[in-house]
Design a protein with these regions (language model features):
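Residue-level preference for nonpolar/small residues embedded in alpha-helices
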Residues: 63-64, 161, 212-213
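A broad structural signal for alpha-helix termini and local helix breaks/kinks
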Residues: 75, 224-225
Length: 225
């Protein structure tokens, strides 16, 4: 997403939302446990398999060994999908990493295997049996330390500046030069992190909860083409 021009007026500017009470459309259903979530469309897919993701234990490096033998032979397991047997996978424009890592690891917790089984519990149990060995590589994990030698992305122009900030700041009667930080924060969503996928002939339907629906659809199509 690129903002390179004024956004113009929006409902927040017109004060039609902020400062006024509004009922959530799905509020009552959520607090009473009747709101349908993405993975609950069982009327469209009555018999489903369950997938459980195995993620990378390192942030940067490569997989030297990925042993799925025990997982393959665990009760209820239908398949163990890795980069080695998944076939060609594309990469969407909005994704920063490939769908399945291997042998190269691009980030911590990158998906490196998907265990598919008849039940969720079987998939989860089998996922714990996947044995992975890594060759860890050095990386940069301190954002503040990396700032001095950071470079601007090539697709963006340099910031537009007006005046001489350094001189004005040095000559100001009162200055404030401080750094403020905040720890990582995670949204506590009520909806489980799960999606439902099913086929009607050659048409694939995905039921998922995603803020960027168009991006999700287009990138998924490019990944699976």
């Amino acid at each position: 997403m690129k903002f390179d021009k004024p956004a113009g007026q929006n409902p927040v500017d017109r004060l039609l939302v902020v400062g006024h009470p509004h009922d959530r459309i799905d509020g009552k259903r959520k607090v009473t446990g009747t709101a349908p979530y993405a993975w609950e469309w069982h009327d469209e897919a009555t018999k489903v398999a369950y997938g459980y993701i195995v993620t990378s234990a390192i942030a940067k490096g490569r997989i030297t060994s990925l042993d799925t033998h025990n997982a393959d032979n665990a009760p209820g397991v239908l398949a163990v999908v890795t980069a080695q047997n998944a076939g060609p996978l594309g990469k969407g424009e909005q994704n920063t990493a490939t769908l399945l890592g291997g042998p190269e690891i691009e980030h911590y917790h990158q998906a490196i295997a998907l265990v598919v089984a008849e039940t969720f519990e079987q998939a989860r149990a089998a996922a714990s049996l996947v044995q992975v060995q890594y060759e860890q590589q050095a990386g940069e994990y301190d954002l503040a330390a990396a700032i001095p030698h950071a470079t601007a992305p090539p697709e963006y122009e340099e910031d537009k500046t007006t005046g001489d900030f350094a001189s004005a700041f040095a000559g100001a009667a009162i200055t404030l030069d401080a750094t403020y930080t905040t720890p990582d924060q995670s949204h506590m969503a009520m909806e489980p992190h799960a999606s439902l996928a099913f086929w009607h002939g050659d048409q694939l339907t995905i039921r998922t909860s995603n803020q960027m629906i168009d991006w999700c659809r287009s990138d998924l199509a490019k990944t699976l083409k």
